């Protein structure tokens, strides 16, 4: 292909981010942020959370205290690898142990005396078992010396049944921007949350609400349930900041539109009226009176001074160690936003914007659960001490309370899909696609209750804040998850930071801010507030904001702060704020830097020559001003040019308006969308459908398929795609394969391949084309006495079992075969019976339609015998199986044709698959034709000019014209065969061939599009869905067929099916289907007097209603279905009388018989 030029530099820089970067510790880019998140938790954060020393109870004015101390936290990795865990059928867990000491502190004149109450040195191997994240190459964060398995990308947990678990990331409920809401006309609220920094444990949360009603401006209050007083926010700001009301008026009015200034004046005047209405008003006295009233209202046990200190000291926990004056100025900045948002709501980030949210990654899940369960654990110890003191008069703790921290249950629930009593966080990962291991951990979803309160989800729209950071194609197109789960783009990741790094970074930023002249960072009246994680630290001179932000960004890129993912956002538009974000959970991605109208990539001419030998971290160190990591908030409030090409077409003045420039369009797709080809050449819906189908494609075998007793579908003879994108290659999806190359022909074939029908060649199937193997888990639990029952049983279902009661290895199971022995015996109460033992055969049987070979058998002996069997089955394509291309051209096998029935070219080659040609025009999938053309061109010239095999790069989204690809194909054919005529060259480029009719051996009149393409087999298999049943299990209550194919259920024959048969006059068939079955047959006696169903008492049928009236009605026997009787009984139980009545008329088909005179005729 052509040599890289300067215009492709942006693309090459984007590729550098995708490839591994060992110098920065990045070995697998797609899931690196998840590995770091979990590693931070288990190596650092877990120790911080569990290391505790705090009072449990206090007595006698804090002179006596019961203390708890948790120390010696140790985390031990497992001794075995994930493969051994699968073989043993065990989970892959790390063990956490700690020591608990509970003692009593008494303050005396001599000092503090300590008396030991209880202690526990946790050495139990089951104290805390933490599911261990398996990283790339089977590595884990505790033992990095584990061997590398290149095709194992990791990102999963293994639970106790050796089943892989993988989960999505959840959007955190707490927003970083206050939430504005219109309660009713002229009534508004502004609610925000304050969370303590990560170094403050336990984490403190406070939620505040500012309310404003235009008709009652005096009631512009801030409140928080049980944690703060309800007070006018203007007066609170004055109390905290110690400034005048005129100062607050000028601060709120500065750089505001006239309508907002008018409202500000009205609010300040209303606050003045409050002060004037109180004689000798004093702001301290006013606040103290409110605190005292709240103290009485809550009936607090604390003294008034302690209560006031707790309330005001814990006000705004995220500014815990900040002076009250800065808290007051922070409240004024919030009020500015609130008043501006009332008039210009559309300019303020709404609650659905990703700007306002952080993302919970794997490490954050475990951190949150560990924090919550530790508080429960300490609370249980406190309650146990109080109960023992109350009942026995001693301070003691039961050992059971000390040894059950409760974390194991929480972590187990997390892997079962429950995170803090909500669902949607984790799910079992089916092993049919490698892409699921990448796409699910890179997905971002919402809490279920977030969906209910959100305006966005009423229409499920793609929020503008998700642009560039999320893939616009890989979203569910139907079902309940539409718009709720989004896929990160290939350049996007989620930030992680250690507590120590957080504190160091915060300190460095504060030192940098304070290096400015004191007066320039003290413009609290008319300046731009500077916040670090929403905590106000300074207020900058408005004339210096541009220089400050530019210098900060340059220092950040040069590594001055030691963190390249710091976000700095200049919020203008009258809200006037500089926001610096350093916390975890932010979405970040790289952008090209524009400085003073110049693209910095162009200002480094030596970069191009050195780029091939550099990693992404090298570029950041040696050319720091070329690329900047930008979080989603900074991106939203920056001017970003769409592409380098557009930027270079602008004038110099226009260029100066931009801060950043984006990479090419292919980097806006996610990893699943990157597996497609030429999205931009097709119609829009094909991209969404293509992503859904690509995730359903069956991929190659995992490294230890025989050791995992788990369900899975695997491609037996996978092939690496020839036409790929860089993201597909670097993520190892291409190397792990998810399809095969087949030869297709676009044509109609005898009218068989209509719509989505495809024709597939029989010999192609026999040679292993798109052949798969199905691994299936069968698990049963059997009572121990039933399993050990040695009674002889003549059931044919036991023919595949060995003497130990388990199915034989390598046995071929058919439908109805037992998996393990399960014989239940009963003893008859008959002394005269010779053999009073009766055995019942109740095994769980194999129910699949196809035979399977037993690969592994695993048994666990507890109170029950748990038998787990892994079966394997090779499954070739059959009628009804589904296939697709990477352009969403899904097809279903309509006919399996012999080679002799198919058309052939001049070389005798027949197509493997025939696809309906009209599908290209109706679905507008031009890129499918381009893929065939490029794959065929590769076959003509598979090596580059250096003699190296090279795939063809055809990104999912690209700005390359189709003519460029045609020119590439032309060069390949000219190089391999320079003597081709123009017509022959054109036919080869466009893959047009003359095919011959197999019946007449004459050529078709028109040329046929004929060439190779990468074809995918989907997990939708006919034998997994087909249901065939004549007789079988029925439910006990209504005696109708079970529901569900797995339980041997039948297809429902309902009212519509009945009506169809009625239309054809098939009365006997209806009777047979609906009633004539020995299980469903029911004789019922009906009272002709009242219509009740008769009851059977001591063998005699009696109408209860009539017998109480001393009536002797006629009982008529009717033939009905059992479910009808159940329905009538249930209706009667609900107080509804259904009367069965009989028609009083002669038979329809007979007339009364003529009278016959039996007198002898001779007597007449």
From Swiss-Prot:
Record keywords, A-Z: DNA-directed RNA polymerase, Metal-binding, Nucleotidyltransferase, Transcription, Transferase, Virion
UniProt protein name: DNA-directed RNA polymerase 133 kDa polypeptide
Organism: Vaccinia virus (strain Tian Tan)
InterPro entries: DNA-dir_RNA_pol_su2, DNA-dir_RNAP_su2_dom, DNA-dir_RNAP_su2_hyb_sf, RNA_pol_132_poxvirus, RNA_pol_bsu_CS, RNA_pol_Rpb2_3, RNA_pol_Rpb2_5, RNA_pol_Rpb2_7
Reaction(s) catalysed by this chain's protein: RNA(n) + a ribonucleoside 5'-triphosphate = RNA(n+1) + diphosphate
Family statement: Belongs to the RNA polymerase beta chain family.
GO biological process, one term: DNA-templated transcription
SUPFAM superfamilies per record: beta and beta-prime subunits of DNA dependent RNA-polymerase
Complex and partners: The DNA-dependent RNA polymerase used for intermediate and late genes expression consists of eight subunits 147 kDa, 133 kDa, 35 kDa, 30 kDa, 22 kDa, 19 kDa, 18 kDa and 7 kDa totalling more than 500 kDa in mass. The same holoenzyme, with the addition of the transcription-specificity factor RAP94, is used for early gene expression.
Cellular component aspect of the GO annotation: DNA-directed RNA polymerase complex; virion component
Gene Ontology terms, MF aspect: DNA binding; DNA-directed RNA polymerase activity; metal ion binding; ribonucleoside binding
Pfam families xrefs: RNA_pol_Rpb2_3 (PF04565), RNA_pol_Rpb2_5 (PF04567), RNA_pol_Rpb2_6 (PF00562), RNA_pol_Rpb2_7 (PF04560), rpo132 (PF12415)
Gene from which the chain derives: RPO132
Entry annotated with the keyword Aminoacyl-tRNA synthetase: no
Protein origin, superkingdom: Viruses
Main function: Part of the DNA-dependent RNA polymerase which catalyzes the transcription of viral DNA into RNA using the four ribonucleoside triphosphates as substrates. Responsible for the transcription of early, intermediate and late genes. DNA-dependent RNA polymerase associates with the early transcription factor (ETF), itself composed of D6 and A7, thereby allowing the early genes transcription. Late transcription, and probably also intermediate transcription, require newly synthesized RNA polymerase.
Primary localisation category: virion
EC numbers: 2.7.7.6
